[in-house]
Amino acid sequence: MKRSELDIVLKELTEQIYNLLGDKLEKVVLYGSYARGDNTEESDVDVLVLTNMEPEENRKILWTLNKIFSRVGLEHDILLSMFLLDKKAFHARKPILPFYQNIEKDGVVVYAA
């Protein structure tokens, strides 16, 4: 997928996430191979959805967010992978987990409150 096509997908995805969460949406971050620019035809699109909600609230919206990701992915014939997390947990784990550090280092912010 070309970057211009990916930008369209990410814009549509972010709009739908924002419509669901409103001001509870903190950030949408593209990470992984598409963010680094080393994606292949088989690569999925990794997206972090960072909220300012409690973990219990995140669990309640997980199913709806999965539906949004699936629908947008099917419409554009691309596999979208979602990682949903609250910002407190992300910042608490970032100093000790390389995965979180890589998102911080390589991630491309698509939306920030």
Where are these regions (language model features)?
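Short beta-strand->loop micro-motif that forms the acidic, two-metal-ion catalytic signature
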Residues: 45-50
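Catalytic core of pol beta-like nucleotidyltransferases
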Residues: 1-26, 36-41, 52-113
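Recognition helix of helix-turn-helix/homeodomain-like DNA-binding domains
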Residues: 33
